[in-house]
Swiss-Prot record:
Higher taxonomy: Bacteria, Bacillati, Cyanobacteriota, Cyanophyceae, Synechococcales
Protein name per the record: Adenine phosphoribosyltransferase
A GO term for molecular function: AMP binding
GO terms classed as biological process: adenine salvage; AMP salvage; purine ribonucleoside salvage
Main subcellular location: cytoplasm
Amino acid sequence: MAESLEQQLRALVRDVPDFPKPGILFRDLTPVMRDPQAWKQVMEGMQQSLAGLQPEVIVGIEARGFIVGTSLAMTMGLGFVPVRKPGKLPGPITAVDYALEYGSDRLEIQEGALSGCQRVLVVDDLLATGGTAAACAELVSRAGGAVCGYGFVAELTALGGRSKLPGGVLVESLIHY
């Protein structure tokens, strides 16, 4: 019996206990990215599950969302727009501040990066608590775009990140923990 894509990818993901702090089990996706055949399968799997949304542009969240986002944008023949942490983008920016478990953070996008009501697919490597992805959705809206869906390589389902994302918008993940 052939292994599913999720099973194949799970076999490559490295579990790192107590990183970045004690009690955390870090799911390291870099072995998947290092394997060209596996990474190609990730992009093909994401394209198949998300193409029906008919996105016009992909927004990737700093930092690993840049890797996923640019790869998927090339696969789908779309443009890519980076959403960055503070102070990394030149020129006028639009920003959103958001709360974290341990404080707050900020995401920024260049003004004019999205055209009015452009259909945006938000991507990142991992969906955990959903706070950053929800903040990115707010930022996309402020910048004039409309989130049509979310794509993640992996999802930590026990953390309930999907519940923080706007209802009625497709959320796809290839690997579920």
